[in-house]
């Protein structure tokens, strides 16, 4: 009698081999998957980083997708000019041109009656007139004393272009548009043979409780902090300085037990706005003990040290930091390349190959 393998055994062996191959393929794919968590306080630029990933590592924004942002941009313009006009009353600032008081009242009436996300000609005329007023500009210069979108002057200075009947938002317009992030937004893309899953979560206090669901298996955290927020208060609590809130949040994340083995990269964002602001507003408004030079370099390095000094495990955990401008595609591309290299290096370390 021969001891040949039965057809059934052969089939079982074939299936077993197929399963092993599938498991190995899944393991290889998982090893190449990077779970990236974007954290930071509200309005620190996280969502702009996500948009940049679409521009840099996906196919960018199609004309149709850009057009979808038109109503968001118009909404941002209206919110911005309304915020300035309301702040004039709060701060006791008068219009330079008395006739602008009527324009201010007209703005409020039109804002109530205009369909959301549209910009009819009479509304454009009123906004244009108000934005040219010296009193409105004086109020804008005190924007740190009230809540105003960073993109306010960008859009208002280009009102004629963005209200043209044939207006199609460009990538910079899209990058500067602001919609509050609620919940968790996932973006997938590939870089240097790695598959990224990037999670952007809402930064306002009410949104943070949702972060916990993203914690497991995170490869890297990018923490965004707005350099320019050193003289500003929170949207949700006007008693709390935004920079102090950001430091408090960073402290809780970089020293959290969940992230003991997670790479952390600090994006000190909005460096362009910070460079302009530091010429006018001393850093001591946020850090009373600071008596250094009020230059971009010295003040920026001081803020960086405030964050990095919070790391309680400096001997075993390095925190990588970069000064960034999230609306500058080339800057984000350069910095994200560096982040990818850090992730590759850390993965090699984990495998004992570095």
UniProtKB/Swiss-Prot annotation:
Residues 265-272 are annotated as: G4 motif. Residues 173-181 are annotated as: G2 motif. One of its GO terms (molecular function) is G-protein beta/gamma-subunit complex binding. Keywords: Cell projection, GTP-binding, Lipoprotein, Magnesium, Metal-binding, Myristate, Nucleotide-binding, Sensory transduction, Transducer, Vision. It comes from the Eukaryota. Disulfide bonds: none annotated. InterPro entries: Gprotein_alpha_I, Gprotein_alpha_su, GproteinA_insert, P-loop_NTPase. One of its GO terms (cellular component) is synapse. Residues 324-329 are annotated as: G5 motif. Mg(2+) binds at residues 47, 181. Guanine nucleotide-binding proteins (G proteins) are involved as modulators or transducers in various transmembrane signaling systems. Transducin is an amplifier and one of the transducers of a visual impulse that performs the coupling between rhodopsin and cGMP-phosphodiesterase. This is Guanine nucleotide-binding protein G(t) subunit alpha-2.
């Amino acid at each position: 009698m021969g001891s040949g393998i039965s057809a059934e055994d052969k089939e079982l062996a074939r299936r077993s081999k197929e399963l092993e191959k599938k498991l190995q393929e899944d393991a290889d794919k998982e090893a190449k998957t990077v779970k990236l968590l974007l954290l930071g306080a509200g309005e620190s630029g996280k969502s702009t980083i996500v948009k940049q990933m679409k521009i840099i590592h996906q196919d960018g924004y199609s004309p149709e997708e850009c057009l979808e942002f038109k109503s968001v941009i118009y909404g941002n313009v209206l919110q911005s000019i309304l915020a300035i006009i309301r702040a004039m009353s709060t701060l006791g600032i008068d219009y330079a041109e008395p006739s602008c008081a009527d324009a201010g009242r007209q703005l409020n009436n039109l804002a109530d009656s205009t369909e959301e996300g549209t910009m009819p000609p009479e509304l454009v005329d009123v906004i244009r007139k108000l934005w040219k007023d010296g009193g409105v500009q004086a109020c804008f210069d005190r924007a740190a004393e009230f809540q105003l979108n960073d993109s306010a002057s960008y859009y208002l200075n280009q009102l004629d272009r963005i209200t043209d009947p044939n207006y199609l938002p460009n990538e910079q317009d899209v990058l500067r548009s602001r919609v509050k992030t609620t919940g968790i937004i996932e973006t997938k893309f590939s870089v240097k043979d790695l598959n990224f899953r990037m999670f952007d979560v809402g930064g306002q206090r009410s949104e943070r409780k949702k972060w916990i669901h993203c914690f497991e298996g995170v490869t890297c955290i990018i923490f965004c902090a707005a350099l320019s927020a050193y003289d500003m208060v929170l949207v949700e609590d006007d008693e709390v300085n935004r920079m102090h809130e950001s430091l408090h949040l960073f402290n809780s994340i970089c020293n959290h037990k969940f992230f003991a083995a997670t790479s952390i990269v600090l994006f000190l964002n909005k460096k362009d706005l910070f460079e302009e602001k530091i010429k006018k507003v001393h850093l001591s408004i946020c850090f009373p003990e600071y008596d250094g030079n009020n230059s971009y370099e010295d003040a920026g390095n001081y803020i960086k040290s405030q964050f990095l000094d919070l790391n309680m495990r400096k001997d075993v955990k390095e925190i990588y930091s970069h000064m960034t401008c999230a609306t500058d595609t080339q800057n984000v591309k350069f910095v994200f390349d560096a982040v990818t290299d850090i992730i590759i290096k850390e993965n090699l370390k984990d495998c004992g190959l570095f």
